[in-house]
Amino acid sequence: MTLSAPSDALVIAGKPYRSRLLTGTGKFKDLDETRLATEAAAAQIVTVAIRRVNIGQDPNAPSLLDVLPPDRYTLLPNTAGCYTAEDAVRTCRLARELLDGHNLTKLEVLGDERTLYPDVVQTLKAAEQLVADGFEVMVYTSDDPILAKRLEEIGCVAVMPLAAPIGSGLGIQNKYNLLEIIENAKVPIIVDAGVGTASDAAIAMELGCDGVLMNTAIAGARDPILMASAMRKAIEAGREAFLAGRIPRKRYASASSPVDGVIG
């Protein structure tokens, strides 16, 4: 299983997690596939779009909680589909009511339907309101290092910069900005959006990200269960490579075999 060692836990809002792979619950063909993919990913935190997924809003419809029970998983309600701070705050309050006072939430305030980029002004506004209201906010944002630091200073418990547009599968487009965010952060930095395959996830972890959240890369794969397993292994490999420390890049060769005692 892709689980960090106990001494290398991902800590969010004071709670340790062994898995650094966070998964979404949308786009799967049914709830059973959602469950199987989540298990294959060994995810402990799963995000839920409150405006799109039933977690009790409709008592007559199948509920995600039937396959991903809160006593086994940390549910991370998100505000996907919100375009204003007001809508996002209202959605978070609804989620807290449905989940019996659960305060951990993923804030998304989108700027437009074509790019699904975050509206940074509305995101800042919503983050301030939610933190003041007692929420533990994990926030989706652009890869702007200044904005990421500002969201941390507001009190967000994790900052989640995009690697590329949501659902694009383009992979990490700006390593420099991500490194700037990581090096200056005192809260977990979790790549959110844009991952397409296992190598993208590994690169994010090799850069020093604390985790990766993904949905489309798994749910949209030809074999979602197998891809979830691949992502789990990639996260583990990338994290171990980061901790091990890569060798520096050089322009010239460096022999790997010792030269002492060479014949001739």
Curated annotation (Swiss-Prot):
Protein localization: Cytoplasm
Biochemical pathway: Cofactor biosynthesis; thiamine diphosphate biosynthesis
Domain of life: Bacteria
EC class of the enzyme, as a word: transferase
Keyword list, A-Z: Cytoplasm, Schiff base, Thiamine biosynthesis, Transferase
Residues forming the catalytic site: K106 (schiff-base intermediate with dxp)
InterPro entries (UniProt xref): Aldolase_TIM, Thiazole_synthase_ThiG, ThiG
Cellular component annotations (GO), alphabetically ordered: 2-iminoacetate synthase complex; cytoplasm
One of the protein's GO biological processes: thiamine diphosphate biosynthetic process
Subunit structure: Homotetramer. Forms heterodimers with either ThiH or ThiS.
Family according to the record: Belongs to the ThiG family.
UniProt name for this protein: Thiazole synthase
Species of origin: Xanthomonas campestris pv. campestris (strain ATCC 33913 / DSM 3586 / NCPPB 528 / LMG 568 / P 25)
